[in-house]
Amino acid sequence: MKQAILSAIFGLCLTVGAWAQVPFGHTPPLHVDGNQLHDPQGNTVVLHGVMDTPSPYFNSWRWGNNANDAHVDACLQYFDKLYTAITDTTQGAFANVFRLHLDPCWTNDPDKKSDGKESGEADISRFSAQRLEKYLRSLYFPLARKAVGHGLYVVMRPPGVCPKTIQAGGEYQQYLMTVWDIVSRNDSVRKYAGQLSIELANEPVQVTDSTGQETPQALQQFFQPIVNKIRANGFTGIIWVPGSGWQSNYRGYATYPIRGYNIGYAVHDYPGWYGTSDSQTDAENGIRQFHEAVPVVDTHPVIITEVDWSPEKPGAGHYNEHGEWVPANYGTWATASTSKWGKTYKQLLDHYGNISMTLSGTGCYIDIDHYLSTGTVRPAFQ
């Protein structure tokens, strides 16, 4: 039963693939037309794939134990193998998008001490613009170019995660301005603007306006200047704009949208969000709650850049970002079954028809170690 249920996760991405008319292995430039992604022939395109990060720790030390020059080639070779696996249609893998985290393990200065204001990946005090420029040239863009060579569009996510509160005009906005200024000025990135897109931030929680208040205009005040900077630098590709509440709240954009062309919105979705779970499988209710929280789905393309699930099993669980208990599972952030929550999630995608997605890790799609040792692609968690 476990194998049958989890194989359905693998099959979900294949089913979503039927929406996109672009042949797999091809990446013609994409643009936004209304609330859809289109290719140059006017075909509607829906993307489906995975996210991952070039981190020794998060990659389970498979290519090395340090983020430094000596390990760049090994990291590139590792991801080239992953790209081969997730696009191997002969073995049933049909990914056509890769969300690339510009992991801070490369952009942080190892010789600089933290200021202690934030912890983990929300700590930007060790960020080095020089290191971002260096590893954009030697690692991040080569990773993106290899992905495109395998028929994958690429969504670039900035280094790290947002601290709990970010303010228009504040330090974190300036950090993102610096990151995307460097990236969008890069000649190679601009050259691939039809294949590479930008997700402005990862999981903002509380976003305040210039006065420090959570107002309907706060999201626009925070992200519009970053969009303007990217466009001023000549990057013409798609920009994915996040919401607040760990990317679950887009209500302010209904009144104060992001202005400009090639704009979409990047959303997160996990079991328990938008009124759906294994015990809440009313698809119509889930569609209504999603629309109430993400009204921009009517006017712009949406990409769910984090989503995962696997069934409950005995063992220790964890608390999620909302402080809610998540029972133990087979290796995902969220716990649910494909036959219950997954079916409801699929109905959401089918209803709107303009929602792309990336699973929250390559290891949520395929069994990485099995592929590396045998060359055989099989679904995760078997």
Predicted feature descriptions by range:
Residues 7-17:
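Bacterial N-terminal signal peptides
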Residues 67-97, 102, 106-197, 218-231:
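An active-site-proximal structural segment forming one wall of the substrate-binding cleft
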Residues 29-30, 54, 58-75, 166-197, ...:
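Extracellular glycoside hydrolase catalytic/binding regions
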Residues 20-51, 60:
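N-terminal module-boundary/linker segments of secreted carbohydrate-active enzymes
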Residues 45, 93, 234:
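Structured loop/turn residues at beta-strand edges in well-structured enzyme cores
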Residues 1-4:
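Positively charged n-region of N-terminal signal peptides that target proteins for export
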